[in-house]
Amino acid sequence: MTDWFARPVLHVRDVEVSLRFYVNRLGFTSPWRYEQDGRARVAQVDRQGCTLILADTWPEKVGKGLIFISVNVEQETREAESAALDALRTELEAKGVPVKEGSWGYRLLVVDDPDGNQLVFNDPAEPAS
């Protein structure tokens, strides 16, 4: 059996602007970028096993992305998982990132990137309040 590895693409207006947001405010790293005519057109960002591609190659799709990112912890207790989401919220808000609470049958943290793509951090083991 082989493993699959997904790299979802988020369509953005300006890859450089998006890179600054994902790296400086969300804590991702960027291992590579593709440049054309002196500007970044596609780039990858990574954080804690999550890999996303940022691309400005399909303008009509800009801002229409929705990505669920599960927050997994080694010690799988409701308290540990809730604490992980709380810590993430504190980290992001300290960097000036607006974070919204949500629910889809379980607790969510929702972050909009500069183009309106949504990153939904979830803890599916925690019931919604």
Identify the function of each model-found stretch:
Residues D37-R41, K61-G63, W104-R107:
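Short acidic/glycine-enriched loop/turn segments that link adjacent beta-strands
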